[in-house]
UniProtKB/Swiss-Prot annotation:
Lineage, top ranks: Bacteria, Pseudomonadati, Pseudomonadota, Gammaproteobacteria, Enterobacterales
Annotated source species: Escherichia coli O6:H1 (strain CFT073 / ATCC 700928 / UPEC)
Protein name: Fatty acid oxidation complex subunit alpha
Gene: fadJ
Sequence segments annotated as region (3-hydroxyacyl-CoA dehydrogenase): 306-714
GO cellular component, one term: cytoplasm
Source superkingdom: Bacteria
Keyword Secreted in record: no
Length: 714
C-alpha cells in the first residue's frame, strides 16, 4: 500500500500554486528521505504549467511549519557516506525548489526549524505569523550536527555572516519580529491572513534581497572575515572546551563557502554532515534526544490521571515563587499561594512579574498577555480559596514535623481528592505521609533551582502512593514544561544521591591541596557546565551540604564529607553567592565583577592550595564515584531504567550531554575499564572507590547497559 503524500498541490484560479505540507499520521511535520520523490513530482508539474505565477509552501498542521528532519533517518545511516548522500539529496532538492522560474514563498506558522528553515531559505521569500509559537532556527548543533541541506551557505548570505554564525553555532531560535528585523523573513502578519499575504508576495517579482548592514558587509570581506572567524573560533573553543566537534566544522564549512564559493561550500557541508553523523558525540546527543522524547510520552503509571483545574502552593520563597511561575505561565493553571507572611506572597508574585516583564522587554510577550498570566496567580495567608484545589505543592523548609503539619492542614482544608506533593530534596516521602488520613494522595515532586530554567523534576511515590496520584503528578510536570522521571523513595532520591559523592570528592581534593579553580576547571573541561565547587557556591553551601548527613546515615561512610571542613566553612558564615562569600568571593549585587577564589579558604580548611593532580586525574575521581552510585541506584530500582538514569543526570545536574549520560558513558568506556579504574583508585584513595557488585559482574560477562537493559526495570 502506497504511503499518502505529505505534500499536496492545489493550483488556484489566480495561477498561484499552494503546496500544503501535512505528514500523514504525525502531530508535527518532519522531513523524511522518501518525501524527495513526492516534491520532485510536484516540481515537474509546476514546470509544465506555463500559466503559473507563483508558488506558496504552507503547513496544514495547527502549530508547526516543519520541525526539522526526522532524526531516525540520520540514526539509520551506517556510514559517513550514507549520511553524506542524505545531505546531498537534501541540497539537490532545495536547489530544485530555488530554481523554479516563478517566485516561491514560504508561509510559516509555528516551528520552522532545521530542515524546515532550510526549505524556507531555498524559497525566494518568507512570510511568518506574529504568533508566539512561531520560531525559526537551525538547532542541528544540539545534536552534534550541522545544517546539511544548504543552511550553512544560504543563511550567511541572507542575514550576514556574524548573525548566521551565532544562530548556527548556538542553535538559537528567533521569534517573528527578530526574524523580520534581521531580514530572515520579508513580512510578519496575523495567522488569519498568512496564506493571503504569502499569495500576494508570490504575485510580485521575486523579493529582492535586503542590503546587509555595513558591519556585516565588512565582515564578509577577506580581512573582516579572517578576524571574525579567528575571534569566534577562540570564543567557541572556550565555551565547548573542544568537546563538541560540530562547532569547529560549522566554522570551517561556512568559511569555505564564503572564501571559495557556494559550490565548494555545499560540498564541504555535505561531507562534514556525513562525518559528524558518525561521531560518538552526535550519537550520544541523538540518544539523549530520543530518550527525552520517550520520557515525555511516559505517563508514569497505568492509571488515568485525575483532572487538573487549579493548583495551590504552600510557601512563597524562591522555590515556591518559581513553581507558581511555571504552573501559571507554562501550564496555564490558576495558582493560589499560601504563606504565613504577606511578604512571602509579594516575593512570589514579584518573581513571576520579573520573569514576564523580562519577556515583554525582549518583545517575546505582549503586555496584555503578561497581565493575563499574572492574573492566574493569587495569594493568601490562610486556606481561603484552597477548598477545591486539585493538587497542592508544598515548598516550605526541610523540616519533617512542619511538612507533616502541612499534610494535616491540607487534608483538613482541601477536598477529599486533593493530592499533596512535597518539594522535598532529602526527606523520605513515607515519613511525610506517615500520619496522613489519605497517604495514597501524598507524593514527592522535587524541582531543581532555578525552577524556570532546570528541565528535570523527580516524582517520588512512597510505597502507598496510588497509581492515579503518580499519573496526575506526571501530567502536571509535563504541563509545566518539565521532563519528569519517577524515582523510588530512598534517601537522596536519584539526582542528589549521585551528585553528593561527586561534590564530596571535590572537597576532599581541596583538603589534599588541590586549588579551587583547578578542580572546577578540570570538571568544566570534562564537560560539566560548572565545576563542583562553583556549583556548591551557586546552590548555597548551607543548602547543598544539608543532605550529606542524611545520605551518610542511610548508606554509610562512603557518603561522609571530609571531617570538619563543611562545619568550618559554615561557621565562617560562608553560604556562597547568596551572601557574597563562599569558596569564591562575589562583588556587590548588581555590579558586573568577576568572582575570585577567596585565598582565606585554604587556611580555614587546613589546606595548602598546592596541588599535584592533573585535570584528567581530578575529573576521574569525581566522575567515577558518580558513575558507581548511578549503577547502585539502578540496582536498587531507585530509577526505573537506564534511560531515566541518563536523562536525570543530563537534565538534573548537567552531566556532559555529548557523553550521553552515566550509563551511556560506562558503555562507551566498557564496564571492564570502569572497574579497573575504580580498583586502582580504591587502592590509592580508599574503599569509597570500590566498584559495586553489578559493575564487577558486567565486567566479567562483557555486558553493557543499553544493550541489556534498554527497557524499564520495574
Amino acid at each position: 500500500m502506497e504511503m499518502a503524500s505529505a505534500f499536496t498541490l492545489n493550483v488556484r484560479l489566480d495561477n498561484i500554486a499552494v503546496i500544503t505540507i501535512d505528514v500523514p499520521g504525525e502531530k508535527m511535520n518532519t522531513l523524511k528521505a522518501e518525501f524527495a520523490s513526492q516534491v520532485r513530482a510536484i516540481i515537474k508539474q509546476l514546470r509544465e504549467n506555463k500559466d503559473l505565477r507563483g508558488v506558496v509552501f504552507i503547513s496544514a498542521k495547527p502549530d508547526n511549519f516543519i520541525a526539522g528532519a526526522d532524526i531516525n533517518m540520520i540514526a539509520n545511516c551506517k556510514t559517513a557516506q550514507e549520511a553524506e548522500a542524505l545531505a546531498r539529496q537534501g541540497q539537490q532538492l532545495m536547489a530544485e525548489i530555488h530554481a523554479l522560474p516563478v517566485p516561491v514563498i514560504a508561509a510559516i506558522h509555528g516551528a520552522c526549524l532545521g530542515g524546515g528553515l532550510e526549505l524556507a531559505l531555498a524559497c525566494h521569500g518568507r512570510v511568518c505569523t506574529d504568533d508566539p509559537k512561531t520560531v525559526l532556527g537551525l538547532p542541528e548543533v544540539q545534536l552534534g550536527l550541522l545544517p546539511g541541506s544548504g543552511g550553512t551557505q544560504r543563511l550567511p548570505r541572507l542575514i550576514g555572516v556574524s548573525t548566521a554564525l551565532e544562530m548556527i553555532l548556538t542553535g538559537k531560535q528567533l521569534r517573528a519580529k527578530q526574524a523580520l528585523k534581521l531580514g530572515l523573513v520579508d513580512d510578519v502578519v496575523p495567522h488569519s491572513i498568512l496564506l493571503e499575504a504569502a499569495v500576494e508576495l508570490a504575485k510580485q517579482d521575486r523579493p529582492s534581497s535586503r542590503p546587509l548592514p555595513v558591519r556585516e558587509r565588512i565582515l564578509a570581506g577577506p580581512l573582516g572575515r579572517a578576524l571574525l572567524f579567528k575571534m569566534v573560533g577562540k570564543k567557541t573553543e572556550q565555551k565547548t572546551q573542544g568537546n563538541y566537534p560540530a562547532t569547529k566544522r560549522i566554522l570551517d564549512v561556512i568559511e569555505t563557502g564564503l572564501a571559495q564559493g557556494t559550490s565548494s561550500g555545499y560540498d564541504a557541508e555535505a561531507r562534514a554532515f556525513g562525518e559528524l553523523a558518525m561521531t560518538p558525540q552526535s550519537q550520544a546527543l541523538r540518544n539523549i534526544f530520543f530518550a527525552s522524547t520517550e520520557v515525555k510520552k511516559d505517563p508514569g503509571s497505568d492509571a488515568p490521571p485525575a483532572p487538573l483545574n487549579s493548583v495551590g502552593i504552600l510557601g512563597g520563597g524562591l522555590m515556591g515563587g518559581g513553581i507558581a511561575y511555571v504552573t501559571a505561565c507554562k501550564a496555564g493553571l490558576p495558582v493560589r499561594i499560601k504563606d504565613i507572611n504577606p511578604q512571602g506572597i509579594n516575593h512570589a508574585l514579584k518573581y513571576s512579574w520579573d520573569q514576564l516583564e523580562g519577556k515583554v522587554r525582549r518583545r517575546h510577550l505582549k503586555a496584555s498577555e503578561r497581565d493575563k498570566q499574572l492574573a492566574l496567580i493569587s495569594g493568601t495567608t490562610d486556606y481561603r480559596g484552597f477548598a477545591h484545589r486539585d493538587l497542592i505543592i508544598e515548598a516550605v523548609f526541610e523540616n519533617l514535623e512542619l511538612k507533616q503539619q502541612m499534610v494535616a492542614e491540607v487534608e483538613q482544608n482541601c477536598a477529599a481528592h486533593t493530592i499533596f506533593a512535597s518539594n522535598t530534596s532529602s526527606l523520605p516521602i513515607a515519613d511525610i505521609a506517615a500520619h496522613a488520613a489519605r497517604p495514597e494522595q501524598v507524593i514527592g515532586l522535587h524541582f531543581f533551582s532555578p525552577v524556570e530554567k532546570m528541565p528535570l523534576v523527580e516524582i517520588i511515590p512512597h510505597a502507598g502512593t496510588s497509581a492515579q496520584t503518580i499519573a496526575t503528578t506526571v501530567k502536571l510536570a509535563k504541563k509545566q514544561g518539565k521532563t519528569p522521571i519517577v524515582v523510588r523513595d530512598k534517601a537522596g532520591f536519584y539526582v542528589n544521591r549521585i551528585l553528593a559523592p561527586y561534590i564530596n570528592e571535590a572537597i576532599r581534593m581541596l583538603t589534599e591541596g588541590e586549588r579551587v579553580e583547578h578542580i572546577d576547571a578540570a570538571l568544566v573541561k570534562f564537560g560539566f557546565p560548572v565545576g563542583p565547587i562553583q556549583l556548591l557556591d551557586e546552590v548555597g553551601i548551607d543548602t547543598g551540604t544539608k543532605i550529606i548527613p542524611v545520605l551518610e546515615a542511610a548508606y554509610g561512610e562512603r557518603f561522609s564529607a571530609p571531617a570538619n571542613v563543611v562545619s568550618s566553612i559554615l561557621n565562617d558564615d560562608r553560604k556562597g553567592r547568596k551572601n557574597g562569600r563562599g569558596f569564591y568571593l562575589y562583588g556587590q549585587k548588581g555590579r558586573k565583577s568577576k568572582k575570585q577564589v577567596d585565598p582565606a579558604i585554604y587556611p580555614l580548611i587546613g589546606a595548602q592550595g598546592q596541588g599535584r593532580l592533573s585535570a584528567p586525574q581530578v575529573a576521574e575521581r569525581c566522575v567515577m564515584l558518580m558513575l558507581n552510585e548511578a549503577v547502585r541506584c539502578l540496582d536498587e530500582q531507585v530509577i526505573r531504567s537506564v534511560r531515566d538514569g541518563d536523562i536525570g543526570a543530563v537534565f538534573g545536574i548537567g552531566f556532559p550531554p555529548f557523553l550521553g549520560g552515566p550509563f551511556r558513558y560506562i558503555d562507551s568506556l566498557g564496564a571492564g575499564e570502569v572497574v579497573a579504574i575504580m580498583q586502582r583508585l580504591a587502592t590509592q584513595y580508599g574503599s569509597r572507590f570500590t566498584p559495586c557488585e553489578r559493575l564487577v559482574e558486567m565486567s566479567k560477562r562483557g555486558e553493557s547497559f543499553w544493550k541489556t537493559t534498554a527497557t524499564d526495570l520495574q
